Amino acid sequence: DGATFEENAMIKATEIAKIANQMPEYKNAVVLADDSGLEIDYLNKEPGIYSARYMGEDTSYDIKNQTLLDRLEGVPDEKRTARFVCAIAAAMPDGSCEVVRGTMEGIIGHEIAGENGFGYDPIFFLPEYGCTSAELSPEKKNELSHRGEGLRKIRKILEHK
């Protein structure tokens, strides 16, 4: 395991690329991999790179979300800043690896809201839109999301290779 989203994405991409390069049909393939998660500033960027495993992999996101809300009980909005992070790595056929970071900034809301999305989306509040990530339309979420930003960045790099 790496210590950052970027390191984890690079490890995934380069390990898969090693396997792919042994198969003739994938010899010159570009391999993409990502590592994503939620950083909450007040909680020293927890859950961070452990977002999926926070409180154990078998713990439901309903419980994870409620636990985070409980930990932030009484914390004012200006100290509830958070971001979704997505690092995307592209392992190139020549052995090099490009990595980018996409982010979506917001705050942790005060309640679980919304049915769209998954994971921490129901507690991730976007003040400028007045709703959680789970309340956005799929189209709007793709436009604003950390993954969408990361994919747009890596695409720009790959188009110039």
What are these regions (language model features)?
Residues 1-161:
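Anionic-ligand binding patches
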